[in-house]
Amino acid sequence: MYQDLIRSELTEAADVLQKFLSDDHNIAQIEAAAKLIADSFKQGGKVLSCGNGGSHCDAMHFAEELTGRYRENRPGYPGIAISDPSHLSCVSNDFGYDYVFSRYVEAVGAKGDVLFGLSTSGNSGNILKAIEAAKAKGMKTIALTGKDGGKMAGLADVEIRVPHFGYADRIQEVHIKIIHIIIQLIEKEMA
């Protein structure tokens, strides 16, 4: 009954991934992001990750696989998702939702740390403010975006952009693949 729809959805997902894969710049940016994070870890730094909605879940997944494990057993790495419900609700109430990530970066981030922000549109105001706060602290920044990069285009030290202009879920599907590869490369760099 839905077989044509299922095939169509999977074909579109494969096409979006193939388009991303066909640009060597994207491959180089993934490697650059992994090296940036591994270099921070080697110097005693940490990575703070953030996103909204599904990207928030991806930010938590990224941090969890750094502190826990990906494919192999190894020491945990200092990854923190900005996801504490009490922090998010406090800052949203007292300052506004645009500040939920930047306030955390201001409080916990340090020179040499890395901010890892995810926004499928590249226009999330709270991620933009987090990038500003991170730069003010001397942190490096990585942005996973989509479409044309939105307002984040060119702001981060490393931007990995999925150039898809359809629904955000296709961008998120590639983002999770990128996250897994970055973790794999970090593990190789740290071995």
UniProtKB/Swiss-Prot annotation:
One GO MF term: D-sedoheptulose 7-phosphate isomerase activity
Record lineage: Bacteria, Pseudomonadati, Pseudomonadota, Gammaproteobacteria, Vibrionales
EC number(s) recorded for this UniProt protein: 5.3.1.28
Organism: Vibrio cholerae serotype O1 (strain ATCC 39315 / El Tor Inaba N16961)
Pfam families (alphabetical): SIS_2 (PF13580)
Biological process terms in GO annotation: D-glycero-D-manno-heptose 7-phosphate biosynthetic process; lipopolysaccharide core region biosynthetic process
SIS domain segment(s): 37-191
Catalytic activity, reaction form: 2 D-sedoheptulose 7-phosphate = D-glycero-alpha-D-manno-heptose 7-phosphate + D-glycero-beta-D-manno-heptose 7-phosphate
Protein name, as recorded: Phosphoheptose isomerase
Cofactors, names only: Zn(2+)
Main location: cytoplasm
Family: Belongs to the SIS family. GmhA subfamily.
